[in-house]
């Protein structure tokens, strides 16, 4: 005879189910469980007196007979594809199955086999997301990897050589020698990583050798001269090798205006960095490029969201990042031309409309690498409070908005950079780069981060404690961050040309190299999931007012944001 329990009791035991609602951190964003792939009455749970015991929820089947390496039980999955509850089976560092776990000898409808060789991660009451992907990283210091991983980032794409002045300002690694050294360093870092080569050149030879040396993309930056000739040449090389191009355009409009840059694109796919303009780009109207089908528009977290402090902090940041001097009037004018409250306010709304597709950090070069996810959800919360529910959201939940915003740092950057066959979503066949969150700490402090199916970092108490939880409790590296586990659970993204030339053996790295694919004509703005709006854009050159399809885009700065100081008292 079936037993009945209250929803509250059920959620406490097995996590929320269909119709239950969950608040994300201390925001006003509410998600609702859309479907449940587990079976009522047959839920599996680990622990004393619980289900996953020999002959009960645990079968006799070996790994060779189909048992999983790891099962995450009763997880609430938050993904661009939906918000649903399921068990997740991991095998060989990948997501093997999503569905119902247990013992097929004693339970009906089992798709995920738990055997004696299966580890269990309790997902009850936890939210599981794909690891975040940050596609705007200045590799200034290796310590960024620790900050990013502990914030839920599992892939970093960018360039640099350390605290050299070229790297402090620009997101690229110049030349094959530097690229080789950087890729060699990745063996010591628990993170999936890709490198941008420098894209600023008017002839192809130097760019081609960087792609062959392992660059998975090329970066055009105004500080190296972002001329129409350089743009055209860089895109031509990228088309030949199937790698993405990221661009930071000409703030001073010296080599041309935004129309000249658009003409140089010639309709070819390109990833536009900090499209709002405060981070750089044609002043004052680079924001217009988000209307074009070949432009994949992103913005960075220093302007996310628009607050009462945003304008004030930007000027000094910009002077440091771009090697400018406060004693030179022209340098000050350059900096001030980029900081416009009108376009920053419009940026909030364009993200909420789905016209801006990607959020990234701009790490240590105006942005904060550990705050990319926080700033994304702060923007979503601000927009809900100022603009209300989205038309596609159902009454009582913010599922559509949540899916739109999580896509900005998971699936869309993966698609943009040819990595979506490996990462970017909670999907069967992809790498098990997963983040577990306590809903109260969602987006702020992960409960656990898995890289390639193994735990890389997690909150942990005193190692001499009698249990794992005595203070001081803070995020620490786990076994997945050490030794050869580190090189066997994370990868380096490179070009197919580098793979063909045997780069791994040539430079002697242990990490697996994986080629990026489909970064050029096969993708465009239409490929940006839940973020493919292309409104007709106008920018007033005198007032900087921004309009989309004739509507003025403006919003007030806020003086309080969620996911902030209350989470960082200790």
UniProtKB/Swiss-Prot annotation:
Location relative to the cell: Cytoplasm
A molecular-function term among this protein's GO annotations: urease activity
Active site: 322
Record keywords: Cytoplasm, Hydrolase, Metal-binding, Nickel, Virulence
InterPro entries in alphabetical order: Amidohydro-rel, Metal-dep_hydrolase_composite, Metal_Hydrolase, Urease_alpha_N_dom, Urease_alpha_subunit, Urease_AS, Urease_asu, Urease_asu_c
Essential cofactor(s): Ni cation
Post-translational modification: Carboxylation allows a single lysine to coordinate two nickel ions.
Pfam families attached to this UniProt entry: Amidohydro_1, Urease_alpha
CC cofactor note: Binds 2 nickel ions per subunit.
Binding of Ni(2+) 2, residues: 219, 248, 274
Domain Urease: 131-570
Broad class of where this protein is predominantly found: cytoplasm
Pathway where this protein functions: Nitrogen metabolism; urea degradation; CO(2) and NH(3) from urea (urease route): step 1/1
Substrates-to-products reaction catalysed: urea + 2 H2O + H(+) = hydrogencarbonate + 2 NH4(+)
Residues recorded as bearing N6-carboxylysine in the entry: 219
GO CC terms in record: cytoplasm
GO BP, sorted A to Z: urea catabolic process
Residues annotated as binding substrate: 221
EC number: 3.5.1.5
Binding residues for Ni(2+) 1: 136, 138, 219, 362
NCBIfam families found in the cross-reference section: PRK13206.1, PRK13207.1, urease_alph
Function noted in UniProt: Disrupting the ure1 operon causes loss of urease activity, decreased resistance to low pH killing in vitro and decreased pathogen survival when inoculated in BALB/c mice by gavage.
Subunit structure: Heterotrimer of UreA (gamma), UreB (beta) and UreC (alpha) subunits. Three heterotrimers associate to form the active enzyme.
Family: Belongs to the metallo-dependent hydrolases superfamily. Urease alpha subunit family.
Protein name listed in UniProt: Urease subunit alpha 1
Organism: Brucella suis biovar 1 (strain 1330)
UniProt lineage: Bacteria, Pseudomonadati, Pseudomonadota, Alphaproteobacteria, Hyphomicrobiales
């Amino acid at each position: 005879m079936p037993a009945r329990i209250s929803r509250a009791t059920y959620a406490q035991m097995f996590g929320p189910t269909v119709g239950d609602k969950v608040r994300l951190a201390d925001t006003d964003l509410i998600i609702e469980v859309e479907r449940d792939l587990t079976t009522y009455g047959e839920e599996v749970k680990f622990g004393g007196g619980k289900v996953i015991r020999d002959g009960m929820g645990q079968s006799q089947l070996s790994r060779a007979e189909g048992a999983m390496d790891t099962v995450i039980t009763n997880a609430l999955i938050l993904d661009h594809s939906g918000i649903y509850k399921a068990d997740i089976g991991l095998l060989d560092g990948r997501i093997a199955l999503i569905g119902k776990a247990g013992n097929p000898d004693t339970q009906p409808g089992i798709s995920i086999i738990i055997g004696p060789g299966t580890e269990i991660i309790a997902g009850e009451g936890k939210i599981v997301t794909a690891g975040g992907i940050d596609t705007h990283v200045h590799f200034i210091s290796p310590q960024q990897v620790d900050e990013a991983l502990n914030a839920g980032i599992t892939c970093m794409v960018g360039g640099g050589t350390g605290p050299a002045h070229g790297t402090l300002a620009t997101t690229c690694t110049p030349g094959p020698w530097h690229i080789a050294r950087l890729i060699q360093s990745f063996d010591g870092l628990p993170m999936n990583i890709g490198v941008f080569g420098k894209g600023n050149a008017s002839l192809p030879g130097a760019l081609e050798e960087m792609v062959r040396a392992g660059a998975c993309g090329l970066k055009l930056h105004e500080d190296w001269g972002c001329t129409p000739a350089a743009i055209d040449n860089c895109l031509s090389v990228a088309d030949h090798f199937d790698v993405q191009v990221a661009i930071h355009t000409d703030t001073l409009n010296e080599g041309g205006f935004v129309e000249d840059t658009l003409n140089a694109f010639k309709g070819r796919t390109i990833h536009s960095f900090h499209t709002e303009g405060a981070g750089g780009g044609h002043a004052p109207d680079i924001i217009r490029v988000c209307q074009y089908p070949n432009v994949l528009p992103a913005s960075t977290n220093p302007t996310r969201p628009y607050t009462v402090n945003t304008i004030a902090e930007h000027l000094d940041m910009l002077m440091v990042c771009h090697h400018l001097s406060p004693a030179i009037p022209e340098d000050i004018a350059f900096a001030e031309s980029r900081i416009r409250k009108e376009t920053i306010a419009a940026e909030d709304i364009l993200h909420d409309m789905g016209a801006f597709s990607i959020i990234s950090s701009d790490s240590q070069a105006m942005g904060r690498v550990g705050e990319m996810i926080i700033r994304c959800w702060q923007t979503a919360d601000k927009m809900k409070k100022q603009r209300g529910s989205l038309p596609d959201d159902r009454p009582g939940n913010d599922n559509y908005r949540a899916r739109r915003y999580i896509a900005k740092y998971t699936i869309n950057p993966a698609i943009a950079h040819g990595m979506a066959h490996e990462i970017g979503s909670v999907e069967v066949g992809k790498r098990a780069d997963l983040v577990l969150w306590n809903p109260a700490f969602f987006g702020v402090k992960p409960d656990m981060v898995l890289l390639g199916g193994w735990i890389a970092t997690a909150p942990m108490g005193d190692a001499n404690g009698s249990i794992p939880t005595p203070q001081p409790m803070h995020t620490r590296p786990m076994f997945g961050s050490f030794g050869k586990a580190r090189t066997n659970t994370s990868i380096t993204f490179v070009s197919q040309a580098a793979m063909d030339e045997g780069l791994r053996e040539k430079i002697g790295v242990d990490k697996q190299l994986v080629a990026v694919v489909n970064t050029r004509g096969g993708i465009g703005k239409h490929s940006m999931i839940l973020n493919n709006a292309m409104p007709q854009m106008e920018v007033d050159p005198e007032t900087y007012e921004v309009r989309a399809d004739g509507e003025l885009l403006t919003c007030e700065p806020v003086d309080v944001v969620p996911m902030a100081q209350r989470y960082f008292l200790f």
